[in-house]
Amino acid sequence: MARDTAILRVTGFVQGVGFRYTTKHVAYKYDVSGTVKNLDDGSVEIHAIAEEENLNKFIDAIKKGPSPGCRIEHVYIYKGAPVEDRKTFDIVY
């Protein structure tokens, strides 16, 4: 099956609250590969690759806030964006 891609930029209180760690667990749950990393402006960027249904479920889970300590202000979603093909989901430091 074809896999879809998306880049998500998540703003709000999303750094220092376990957001990347819990995002990785959500990615495993929905069989999503890609990366998650903190950006210098305080936001988090996610590169995601998965079958369409799983990618949509992953995005919905991110919008709800995977970490109990986070507060999501906005999730910018760029579907179909070019993303490096990966077999795993990794935290980028």
Curated annotation (Swiss-Prot):
- What are the alphabetically sorted keywords of the record? Hydrolase
Residue span(s) of domain Acylphosphatase-like:
5-93
Q: Which GO terms describe its molecular function?
A: acylphosphatase activity
The source's superkingdom equals: Bacteria
Q: What is its EC number?
A: 3.6.1.7
Q: Where is the active site?
A: 20, 38
Q: Which InterPro entries does this one have?
A: Acylphosphatase (IPR020456), Acylphosphatase-like_dom (IPR001792), Acylphosphatase-like_dom_sf (IPR036046), Acylphosphatase_CS (IPR017968)
Enzyme class, spelled out: hydrolase
Q: Which reaction does it catalyse?
A: an acyl phosphate + H2O = a carboxylate + phosphate + H(+)
User: What is stated as this protein's family in its record?
Assistant: Belongs to the acylphosphatase family.
> What protein am I looking at?
Acylphosphatase
